[in-house]
Design a protein with these regions (language model features):
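Extreme N-terminal basic, low-complexity initiation segments
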Residues: 1-10
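Multi-pass alpha-helical transmembrane bundle typical of ion/small-solute transporters
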Residues: 14-234
């Protein structure tokens, strides 16, 4: 009986598939084929999902760290009411800082909702912005210990202004490098106004810290309130 020839296993060839990133860039009427090729040829991860994920994680940690500076009173029952009242300024600084960090998270969520591609420059600008967010619990703790001291108010105001500046730079970098989808001109104007609110109020708060520290704190409170009035329509 004639033996059957041994069949050699068929080699399976895998073809490297290049993802089509053209769907993530601006419409063809705004972006030519050369711009799409220029973005696709960059040897760098282009998916913004990981950048957004680590940003959300940093915001969650920063919001949690704020409350760690508020210690519960450890006194007997007869002094508990006065001890709770004594912690009111610290609780107020916590609430203010929570609102400011929440405002920056909303602004970051809104801005990066337009971003479809990430390059090295935008990645590091986002990390610089996250650095300013992580420092905010420290600035808040100093302000809670010395709520009417000009150096503490200056530190807090400078931190808030740095948060706004780095986020604004990241936004305009993404728009200038065509890493975002097409943004209407009126929407760009709205974002520009929003990015100028918090640094302006923070700088004014720093300027009047030595003569009117309470007014400085009021200006800090106005940052999330004023920004909410110009919230995005998306």
């Amino acid at each position: 009986m004639k033996a059957r020839p041994t069949e050699r296993p068929q080699k399976i060839r895998f073809r490297k598939l290049a993802p089509n990133y053209a769907q993530f860039v601006m419409p063809r009427r705004e972006t030519g084929r050369d711009d799409i090729d220029r973005i696709e040829d960059r040897p760098f991860p282009k998916d913004p999902s990981r950048v957004i994920a680590i940003s959300d994680g940093v915001f969650a940690v920063a919001l949690t760290l704020l409350i760690l500076d508020v210690k519960p009173p450890t006194v007997n029952q007869t002094l508990l009411a006065s001890a709770i009242i004594a912690t009111a300024p610290r609780l107020g600084i916590f609430a203010l800082s929570f609102a400011i960090v929440a405002y920056y998270w909303v602004s970051h969520h809104f801005s990066f909702g337009y971003v479809r591609l990430i390059d090295r420059g935008l990645l590091w600008l986002n990390m610089l912005f996250l650095f300013t967010i992580v420092v905010l619990p420290f600035s808040a703790a100093v302000l809670a210990d010395y709520p009417l001291a000009a150096p503490a108010i200056t530190l807090y105001g400078a931190n808030v202004a740095a948060c706004s500046a780095t986020l604004a730079i990241a936004w305009w970098y993404a728009v200038g490098k065509r890493l975002s989808i097409d943004v209407r001109r009126d929407e760009r104007r709205r974002v520009a106004i929003r990015t100028m609110i918090s640094p302006t109020l923070a700088i004014v708060g720093i300027a009047v810290a030595t003569i009117a520290p309470v007014a400085s704190l009021v200006l800090f409170v106005a940052i999330p309130v004023a920004s909410y009035t110009l919230r995005p329509t998306r």
